[in-house]
Amino acid sequence: MASQILPLELIDRCIGSRIWVIMKSDREFTGKLLGFDDFVNMVLEDVTEYETTPQGKKTTQLAQTLLNGNNICMLIPGSVGPDEEG
Amino acid sequence: MDNSPPPPSNESPPPQPPPPQATHTGSPTDFLKGVVGKRVIVRLTSGVDYRGLLSCLDGYMNIALEQTEEHVNGVVTNRYGDAFIRGNNVLYISAAEPI
Amino acid sequence: MDLSSSGIQEPFDLIRLSLSERVFVKLRGDRELTGILHAYDGHMNLIMSDVEETILIVDTDSVPTGQGVLQVAKRKMEMLFVRGDGVILVSPPART
């Protein structure tokens, strides 16, 4: 049988490296993944938050942050985020 | 790992043994332990920010803040001595001072 | 869990200590209430009396950049049940 990797195993392998988080809304985050739980609440470090508003794009720098897993849509491991394609 | 709310009473002993390692694992639980009593920024999904001293929180991410300032688009729009924030509105909790 | 300065160990303690007091409640849909808190439950369903509701009517059409303020409507209600899922924030009176 082909070896299969569980989705959360992939995220577990991302701990310690940077990750790109895309929310269900027009909001994205990048940062170093420190940990996560069963709800995929994530602890990130050196975070950049990207917002797309009617007034244009906005970024916010954040220190250690607990991101609520409830609104997460996609995770892109090892990516630097929307600025440059990793 | 366990993100369920704490039991309502402490009459019975806790069902689970303490985690084997007390070291920093970077999990959400550890983050929250480190950040209680510190200044935090709580952003809601609506984009409104609350900056204040984190008194405590529970497994639903319900939050009690002290000395709270409400920020909308970078402008202080309200101040509260204490504030209870219902967890379903929370987008993130960010440390506003070193943990 | 650590308690910082007060006797609050979980967020609901803040609400419990506000029973029979006048509280400020922020709701979804740009609504705000002030009133006496009589009861609450784990959903944050609330029973309040002597309530004044403030509705912020944001007119985004006239101001294309958004956050166009607005018109304020107020009304009073004697006794009110608030469904918990609409609650964003509850602020008790200042503790001493």
UniProtKB/Swiss-Prot annotation, chain B:
Span of domain Sm: 27-99
UniProt region (Disordered), positions on chain: 1-30
MF GO annotations: RNA binding
UniProt subcellular location: Cytoplasm; Nucleus
Swiss-Prot/TrEMBL keywords: Cytoplasm, mRNA processing, mRNA splicing, Nucleus, Ribonucleoprotein, RNA-binding, rRNA processing, Spliceosome, tRNA processing
PROSITE patterns hit by this protein: SM
UniProt GO cellular component terms: nucleolus; P-body; sno(s)RNA-containing ribonucleoprotein complex; spliceosomal complex; U4/U6 x U5 tri-snRNP complex; U6 snRNP
Top-level taxon of the source organism: Eukaryota
Disulfides per UniProt: none
GO terms for biological process, alphabetical: maturation of SSU-rRNA; mRNA splicing, via spliceosome; tRNA processing
Bias (Pro residues): 1-21
Homology family: Belongs to the snRNP Sm proteins family. SmF/LSm6 subfamily.
Subunit structure of this chain's protein: Component of the heptameric LSM1-LSM7 complex, which consists of LSM1, LSM2, LSM3, LSM4, LSM5, LSM6 and LSM7. Component of the heptameric LSM2-LSM8 complex, which consists of LSM2, LSM3, LSM4, LSM5, LSM6, LSM7 and LSM8. The LSm subunits form a seven-membered ring structure with a doughnut shape.
Annotated protein name in UniProt: U6 snRNA-associated Sm-like protein LSm6
The organism of origin for this protein: Laccaria bicolor (strain S238N-H82 / ATCC MYA-4686) (Bicoloured deceiver)
Taxonomic lineage: Eukaryota, Fungi, Dikarya, Basidiomycota, Agaricomycotina
Gene name in the database record: LSM6
